[in-house]
Amino acid sequence: YYPFNFELRIEVSLKSNCLEFEISIYNKSDFPMPINFGLHPYFNISDFKNLEFINSPLNCLNQEKNIISNTLDELNNINLGVDLLMYTSGRSIFRDKVFKRQVSLIHPYPFDIGVIWSDPPRRMVCLEPWTSPRNSFVDGLRNIMIPSKDSRRFDASIQIKSLN
């Protein structure tokens, strides 16, 4: 049960090698409305051993163990399954050396929290843009409030580049 009347609009545009998302959340209620919003795009991969992550932050939060850890060390375990939250520059990028492609998630502030998630044996990786970390409604960390009768807009895009 979510005690607010709201409208969520996601406009998706397909461009050459790019999928653009324009997200609008409108608070129709008479009270300020807290939000924590994210997308969950999954990407087919050749194999975990063929992935290379580009310009990832030095540290991340291992959400399974709830500990801060070195991002590269954690990504070395992606074939075992990971759930990693990071405060990014607004870009999350990986390359698949066998599929010869680079996937870039562009997710500017306040959509710049990134989660990398894998669930072996499924050959996929999830790059998720988020506005706030887990439990933001409870602890207030990066909690976003939309005033009554107002809206908030978020943008993200996924770009695919051939590495041939």
Spans of features found by a protein language model:
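Glycine-rich active-site loops that engage anionic ligands at enzyme catalytic sites
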Residues: 96-134
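Acidic, contiguous internal or C-terminal segments within carbohydrate-active enzymes
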Residues: 1-35, 39-41
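Active-site/ligand-binding surface loops and adjacent short beta/alpha elements
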Residues: 32-34, 41-108
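Short beta-strand and strand-turn-strand segments in soluble, beta-rich domains
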Residues: 134-140
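A short, structured loop/turn motif at beta-sheet edges
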Residues: 13-18, 45-52, 96-97, 118-122, ...
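Short Pro-Gly-centered flexible turn/kink motifs
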Residues: 23, 145-162
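Beta-strand-rich interaction surfaces with strong enrichment in secreted/lumenal proteins
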Residues: 9-11, 141-146
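Intrinsic-disorder/low-complexity, polar/charged segments enriched in Ser/Thr/Lys/Arg/Asp/Glu/Gln
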Residues: 7-9, 18-20, 89-91, 100, ...
